[in-house]
């Protein structure tokens, strides 16, 4: 297992240990104690807002430790956040199964909540019987629906002196001495982010003071994915390889695909390739657990495996090497338009034929068979569903698409001539045949010779409203 990060090793266990946030901590205590005294606050959610590394997440876990709560941590960046909150919200109604530990639902990165899910999350807050705490770097980017339901607690940016004092305390507990000028440089570059400063301190201590300036400067440079791959595959040094994802604007999941793709191009020995893939598979396990549980602290173990684990797997090619983008991303990029067209067709089937998504998917298979074997019927379906030219090509293929599209255009013109609006095509009223407008001279004479009473009866009969019947799809196609 990798060495425990100092950020976790020295994370405060009590609220009183949190650096220079006394006013915020006082508000948090008052809020949580109102729950414990049986008088839940008016606002059942707490929103901790402040810059990165100011102690927001640490507050939640110190609070849970001090008051004996269990923390259920979720991340708002996850697309399935609302689903997870819905699944776990039962924990906000009741205590633990044994009734011994209450739960805190902790929603991190609340400023990344999608507006579409904000109203639903706000409803869940209203139902809560146990505390819900959220954290955000940018308060103004938290959806209004959430802000209105939460009590705001502001965290101030830590000063350079605050950061320095915290670093010195860690060094004393480790029994290590670091030159003062290096500590000053770390504190200065952190911009009040204590978490980043502690990570930098550990990196400098592990890597050696002589490289401290280079290591710290490296944090300020945004890398490309090719530079990151160069660190992984261009060095046998695990410590250096771990720096690969610093300032890389890419998620660990995506970077894993890049590393995975390039292993067979860079390693020479089959056994070493297998060892590198073993590290990749372990990284993938950690990423999967993080996604399922919302515990994104597991990312650090995944990153260690996909960088340092791969770097030390064996001998690599020397000299100029070419890096390749992952086939997975290439396939997804190439199939993006195709997937969008398929989804559009499914939605049109659902709308026009009034069926579920699963039924629509099965129906599309049948429609595809029709498009490949019956061009006339395919043209009718094109008009009925309102398909575009690309959607027709998706269903029939390039060779037949032109013919079907031409027939569909002709059918649309015919429908317009008949006065049938396309938006009414799923349900058309088929009127009973009207009497022929042009009658022969003999028929006109017969009508004139009829008694007046018969004429009156016929007139009343004509004035009666004509009955229509609801057309089916097959009636429409027959036209």
Swiss-Prot record:
Membrane-spanning intervals of the chain: none
GO molecular function, one term: DNA clamp loader activity
CDD domains listed in its UniProt record: AAA, HLD_clamp_RFC
Region (PCNA interacting protein box (PIP-box)): 469-479
Residue positions binding ATP: 50-57
Keyword Transferase carried by entry: no
Region (Disordered): 424-479
Listed Pfam families: AAA, RCF1-5-like_lid
Sequence ranges of Acidic residues compositional bias: 430-456
Keywords recorded for this protein, A-Z: ATP-binding, DNA replication, Nucleotide-binding
Subunit structure: Heteromultimer composed of three to four small subunits (RfcS) and one to two large subunits (RfcL).
Function comment: Part of the RFC clamp loader complex which loads the PCNA sliding clamp onto DNA. The complex possesses DNA-dependent ATPase activity which is further stimulated by PCNA.
Family: Belongs to the activator 1 small subunits family. RfcL subfamily.
Protein name: Replication factor C large subunit
Species this protein is from: Pyrococcus furiosus (strain ATCC 43587 / DSM 3638 / JCM 8422 / Vc1)
């Amino acid at each position: 297992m990798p060495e425990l990060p100092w950020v976790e090793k020295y994370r405060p266990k009590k609220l009183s240990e949190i650096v220079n946030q006394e006013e915020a901590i006082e508000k948090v205590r008052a809020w949580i104690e109102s729950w414990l005294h049986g008088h839940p606050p008016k606002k059942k959610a707490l929103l901790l807002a402040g810059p990165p590394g100011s102690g927001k997440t640490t507050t939640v876990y110190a609070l849970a430790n001090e008051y004996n709560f269990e923390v259920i941590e979720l991340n708002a960046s996850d697309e399935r956040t609302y689903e997870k909150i819905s699944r776990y919200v039962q924990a906000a109604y009741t205590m633990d199964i044994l009734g011994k530990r209450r739960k805190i639902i902790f929603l991190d990165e609340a400023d990344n909540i999608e507006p579409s899910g904000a109203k639903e999350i706000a409803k869940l807050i209203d139902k809560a019987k146990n505390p819900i705490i959220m954290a955000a770097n940018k308060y103004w980017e938290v959806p209004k629906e959430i802000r209105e339901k939460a009590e705001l607690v502001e965290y101030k940016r830590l000063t350079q002196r605050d950061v320095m004092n915290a670093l010195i305390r860690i060094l004393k507990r480790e029994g290590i001495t670091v030159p003062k000028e290096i500590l000053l440089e770390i504190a200065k570059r952190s911009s009040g982010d204590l978490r980043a400063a502690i990570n930098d301190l550990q990196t400098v201590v592990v890597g050696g003071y002589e490289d401290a300036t280079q290591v710290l400067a490296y944090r300020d440079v945004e890398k490309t994915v090719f530079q990151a791959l160069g660190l992984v595959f261009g060095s046998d040094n695990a410590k250096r390889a771990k720096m690969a994802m610093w300032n890389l604007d890419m998620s660990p999941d995506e970077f894993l695909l890049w590393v995975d793709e390039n292993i067979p191009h860079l390693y020479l020995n089959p056994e070493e390739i297998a060892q590198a893939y073993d590290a990749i598979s372990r990284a993938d396990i950690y990423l999967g657990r993080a996604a399922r549980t919302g515990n994104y602290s597991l990312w650090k173990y995944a990153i260690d495996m996909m960088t340092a684990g791969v770097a030390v797997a064996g001998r690599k090619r020397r000299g100029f090497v070419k890096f390749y983008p992952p086939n997975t991303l290439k396939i997804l990029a190439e199939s993006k338009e195709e997937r969008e067209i398929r989804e559009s067709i499914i939605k049109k089937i659902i709308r026009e034929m009034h069926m579920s998504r699963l039924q629509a998917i099965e129906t599309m298979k049948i429609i595809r068979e029709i498009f490949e074997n019956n061009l006339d019927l395919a043209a009718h379906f094109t008009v009925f569903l309102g398909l575009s030219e690309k959607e027709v090509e998706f269903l029939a293929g390039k060779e037949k698409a032109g013919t079907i599209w031409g027939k569909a255009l002709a059918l649309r013109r015919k429908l317009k001539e008949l006065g049938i609006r396309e938006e009414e095509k799923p349900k058309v009223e088929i009127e009973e045949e009207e009497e022929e407008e042009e009658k022969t001279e003999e028929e006109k004479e017969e009508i004139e010779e009829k008694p007046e009473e018969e004429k009156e009866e016929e007139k009343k009969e004509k004035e009666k409203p004509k009955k229509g019947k609801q057309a089916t799809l097959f009636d429409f196609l027959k036209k």
